[in-house]
Amino acid sequence: MNKIVKTFQVAVFLTLGFIVTGYYLLSALNIILFLFLRDFVTISLSTDSMHGSKNPEKWDIRNLVKIGISVGAIQVVEMLILFFVGIRYLDLGNNIGVMNTFFHGDNFFFGLLTPIIVRENYFFWKSAPGRTLMVSIIGDMVVVSILSLFGFGMVAPVTLIDFVFILSYGLFMNLLVNDVFKVLLKKVGLSR
């Protein structure tokens, strides 16, 4: 389901961002960094500490896709809200490099937190992620944080205030709003 959510969210958000601004919200380097760093988390999912059921799992692929697209759609709306705030109040429209870094951080934090919420049928805190998964997520967050704040000639740095806003927004939206939304989808009959 993680793959469905991310593919939908990234494709739709970047397409809408380009249509609205005429600019790519992520540079080619941002996309390469995103894919490279996110792979560590994707690979570490195989070592997660989730316990399987006593009986063989029977997945309803149609429902998995519906849930994935629903969570992806709410993430697109949340990212569009952040886009509006960034352009309107944080003055990101004047510097393409800073805008790229801002949305790279946004996209990245949403991408890192999605496995945390979709790995569990109920609220994400019902079971702790495996050590390798958490180390991968935290390690990636540290790398992206350092790159976003300092740039090192690779990307345009964002301000500390902008960065804290991106991180706080991503944590709140994913670990609270999106997780509750996922549980509500289950309550209305959409489950794996």
What are these regions (language model features)?
Residues 1-123, 147-151, 169:
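Membrane-embedded transport module
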